[in-house]
UniProtKB/Swiss-Prot annotation:
The keyword Ribosomal protein does not apply. The lineage of its organism: Eukaryota, Metazoa, Chordata, Craniata, Vertebrata. This is Testis-specific serine kinase substrate. Keywords: Cytoplasm, Cytoskeleton, Phosphoprotein. Phosphorylated on serine residue(s) by STK22A/TSSK1 and STK22B/TSSK2. Pfam families: TSKS. Coiled coil: none annotated. GO terms for cellular component: centriole; cytoplasm. Its main location: cytoplasm. It is found in: Cytoplasm, Cytoskeleton, Microtubule organizing center, Centrosome, Centriole. The gene is TSKS. It comes from the Eukaryota. Residues 234-264 have a biased composition (Basic and acidic residues). GO terms for molecular function: protein kinase binding.
Amino acid sequence: MASVVVKTIWQSKEIHEAGDTPTGVESCSQLVPEAPRRVTSRAKGIPKKKKAVSFHGVEPQMSHQPMHWCLNLKRSSACTNVSLLNLAAMEPTDSTGTDSTVEDLSGQLTLAGPPASPTLPWDPDDADITEILSGVNSGLVRAKDSITSLKEKTNRVNQHVQSLQSECSVLSENLERRRQEAEELEGYCIQLKENCWKVTRSVEDAEIKTNVLKQNSALLEEKLRYLQQQLQDETPRRQEAELQEPEEKQEPEEKQEPEEKQKPEAGLSWNSLGPAATSQGCPGPPGSPDKPSRPHGLVPAGWGMGPRAGEGPYVSEQELQKLFTGIEELRREVSSLTARWHQEEGAVQEALRLLGGLGGRVDGFLGQWERAQREQAQTARDLQELRGRADELCTMVERSAVSVASLRSELEGLGPLKPILEEFGRQFQNSRRGPDLSMNLDRSHQGNCARCASQGSQLSTESLQQLLDRALTSLVDEVKQRGLTPACPSCQRLHKKILELERQALAKHVRAEALSSTLRLAQDEALRAKNLLLTDKMKPEEKMATLDHLHLKMCSLHDHLSNLPLEGSTGTMGGGSSAGTPPKQGGSAPEQ
């Protein structure tokens, strides 16, 4: 028979994997490698109460399902002073922490697995122990599923944050592209202004040239009128000269001398008539006084010389034709210049219209660019706030992961609970067959009432509520401080998701609290039953009464575990604490 060592698991680091050992041999240093000094103090004197890890959320499972120890829960930040006790079958090889314990124990009990014989001392389908174990397993499996769903939701939130960051980068690229387009438009506007200035200068030059051409055409028209008047004055004199020619041919001899005398007189008379004719006609322009002298010199040649009488009109007609052709060319040039000026004026008007439209577009674009700048600044602020919230969420998830890991390592040490409960069931079935079951019920109650009362006082609803308030104060403050509504819809959706994750984390925390208290109570009851069964000093009648009392306690604990909900709330904490309160049928009277 291997000796039984009672140990206390003080911290989460001291909880290690401890399964069913068929040989029942395991040293104390293997169970608790990190706390040898605490084991020594445990063996020497009264143990000091220290903080242990608490769990929450137990729901019974069907009796036909297999019992697996899938202990994977979220660790609670609040701790109680109830020690989490662990039992394992081991031989008395440890001389430091187990000698005193083994000496105190007068009886020995083999904690190996169930016997290989098919005939068991109890019913394998017993409703009490099987449903308790199945309920514990079901609660642990559900807690594991809830933690897995929380991790999946956290991954989805991270993916959404990454998509928002990609959208913000695309928006920044679009704003940079718009800024480049604005710079190109500014350069194009400057070029258009330069072109308009050049067109304006060319239009002014064209107007100056047109005015000069108009002045030249007016001068030419005045000269043409002057020449026409001279021709009109010259026509009657030419007719008189033609009539006088036959008379001069008939009397050449008689009038030679008078003709020679008349030539200078005629020249003098023409010279005297020339200025008179010029004074009678329209005066020429002041800038060309030499033009009327040309017909003034031609008329006396035709007047005084007979053979050259027809040269004067012929030369004047050629000059008139040249003048007319020059005037026509001038008119065509003026008309072409006018048409060109009209075209340039139309181009200038079109350019001005385009400039007006472009100015409106530039104003609109500047307004859009300013709005885009404001939106970019707002987006940058929202992105910064979103990054802060994402960092906080990542920190919270990391803390949750660390808590889950530590909780998993702690729950892996609860493996010995299964053989303890099985052994307790066997002993209970064997002990119920005794004859004196109800003789010393009150005396057995008096032996354990003080401890039950202490357990009930430690696991009261008020203490659990205080622990929960203390643990959740920081989280509630963070939620209240960050309860501001974000600006953009995406940030609002992300904020809602973060709040939902926080609520779920709070619910998981409360469920873990209730489950931890329930598991602690179950382990305490199992340890108490183990100690009672190992005591040889107790009489058989007292053993039977004590076992009956423990049976009643286990039934009440099973009822509380069956009624324990898995939804995280304050009422659940109260239910978990009420489940942990032992019944005060026989132990409350001596305590009072």
